[in-house]
């Protein structure tokens, strides 16, 4: 299996779109997650991340420039008990609400499809981290159109039990830049998680995202034993 460094992987593309990273810290004591957004249009770049308790939402940086809040204003992060949900759209709420009714992550996402932003039909990417019995597991999902055909939805879920320390999985919306934008292909990528503080990891990710296209970054460390969290947010718009 190919294991990439965060720097090499992020530098491999100028435009990942939106990306989710989930893994276990090198010391095995923390669950680690990151979510970033990139943008090419004025509307997409006109955003910031705002923390609301344990949750996080997107917000227009300049309300006067907001053209269409559809698909770009949502909660990327919500916490339900011992579960942390991270997604690139309002499916965060779908997962939260249906898991709260005892449905599974995969069942909740059966009610959703890719985004309706023709011709890209941006994939919906999602992740959930669960702490239990002194350990952690997580799952990732991507919902995407079949070769750009909006009548067909392909659904992939990847589950990771007792993940290896010092490793993370990375999934993002686009395979490369283009018009239309080609959807992510294959399994989530495997990244090396260095033995660093949350501030150092945040800086590592932010520094290696494309300078022109990066918009915002969220990083969280979750203590597997206690559930205590450390969170960092970086916004290009200030």
Question: What feature does the model see in each segment?
Answer:
Residues 1-238:
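Conserved short alpha-helical segments that host acidic/polar catalytic motifs at enzyme active sites
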């Amino acid at each position: 299996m190919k294991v990439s460094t965060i720097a090499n992987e992020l530098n491999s593309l100028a435009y990942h779109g939106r990306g989710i990273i989930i893994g276990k810290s090198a010391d095995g004591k923390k669950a680690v997650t990151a979510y970033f957004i990139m943008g090419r249009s004025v509307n997409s770049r006109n955003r910031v991340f705002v923390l609301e308790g344990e949750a996080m939402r997107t917000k227009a940086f300049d309300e006067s420039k907001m053209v269409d809040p559809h698909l770009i204003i949502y909660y990327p992060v919500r916490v339900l008990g011992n579960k942390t949900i991270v997604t690139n759209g309002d499916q965060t709420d779908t997962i939260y609400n249906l898991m709260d009714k005892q449905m599974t992550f995969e069942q909740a996402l059966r009610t959703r499809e890719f985004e309706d932003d023709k011709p890209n039909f941006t994939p919906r990417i999602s992740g959930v981290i669960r702490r239990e019995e002194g350990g952690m597991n997580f799952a990732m999902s991507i919902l995407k159109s079949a070769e750009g055909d909006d009548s067909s939805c392909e659904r992939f879920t990847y589950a990771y039990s007792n993940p290896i320390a010092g490793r993370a999985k990375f999934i993002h919306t686009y395979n490369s830049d283009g018009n239309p934008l080609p959807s992510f292909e294959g399994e989530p990528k495997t990244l090396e998680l260095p033995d660093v503080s949350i501030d150092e990891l945040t800086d590592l990710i932010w520094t290696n995202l494309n300078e022109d296209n990066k918009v915002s970054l969220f990083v969280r460390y979750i203590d597997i034993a206690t559930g205590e969290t450390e969170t960092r947010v970086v916004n290009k718009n200030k």
